[in-house]
A protein has these predicted regions:
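Structured alpha/beta or helical-core interaction and ligand-binding surfaces enriched in interleaved
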Residues: 1-184, 189-214
Length: 214
């Protein structure tokens, strides 16, 4: 199976993200570049995974409470605060991974892999991400099925740290999450039953599933 078939499995014949792409727009993405199209088409099923229960519209206030990975450069006192927040998101993703076949579409083949690897905190992770980068480049693909939790967490860290954009497709639950928006991650959930489950998981881990219609 390829990523196009996986994406088709989310909506069947009801809709395809490619329908929203203008004909004169060059796009080779099955889903990665289309979070906004999904949200426009299905606002009631679209959410953000977020640190905050509501959008903070005052930018001055948001900047004072926001935290992201690059803020920790030259400021070691922030790294533990950042890692605590990151772990909350990783716990949610781990639980989704455990119950699903997981596919990704990613920009990893198109980025400077040395720069991306520098954001990872162990030599094993740096080596592995370079291996995956080479494999994807050699195959000419931007997508893969993730069977290994270690590989899954590599992409999580690279996305949350804003180094590599990736969309995660949790095939069984028909949940899609786009990562490279620091700690605000667009999400689509097709089935209300699994949306409710995800809401409980988020609450347990200390983050919010924020509706776009709130």
């Amino acid at each position: 199976m390829n990523i196009t078939k996986v994406v088709e499995g989310i909506w069947g014949k009801k809709w395809s993200p490619s329908e929203g792409v203008e004909q004169d727009t060059e796009c080779d993405s099955a889903l990665l570049d289309h979070s906004h199209l999904v949200a426009e088409r299905f606002p009631q099923k679209s959410f953000n995974l977020d640190r905050f229960p509501l959008q903070i519209k005052n930018q001055t206030i948001f900047e004072q409470v926001n935290i992201f990975f690059d803020m920790t450069d030259g400021n070691p006192s922030l790294i533990q605060s950042y890692l605590r927040e990151e772990e909350k998101f990783k716990q949610v993703f781990r639980k989704l991974w455990a119950y699903n076949s997981v596919w990704i579409e990613t920009t990893l083949p198109n980025v400077n892999v040395e720069t991306a690897a520098d954001a990872l905190d162990s030599e094993n992770k740096k080596i592995r991400v370079k291996e995956i980068h080479s494999q994807l480049k050699a195959s000419g693909s931007k997508s893969m099925k993730i069977n290994n939790l270690h590989d899954f967490e590599l992409f999580l860290e690279l996305g949350l740290r804003e180094k590599v954009s990736t969309v995660y497709i949790f095939e069984d639950m028909k949940i899609c999450v786009w990562s490279n928006f620091d700690f605000t991650l667009p999400l689509y959930s097709d089935d209300d039953k699994y949306t409710e489950l995800l809401q409980r998981i988020c609450t347990t881990e200390g983050i919010y599933l924020r509706s776009l219609t709130d």
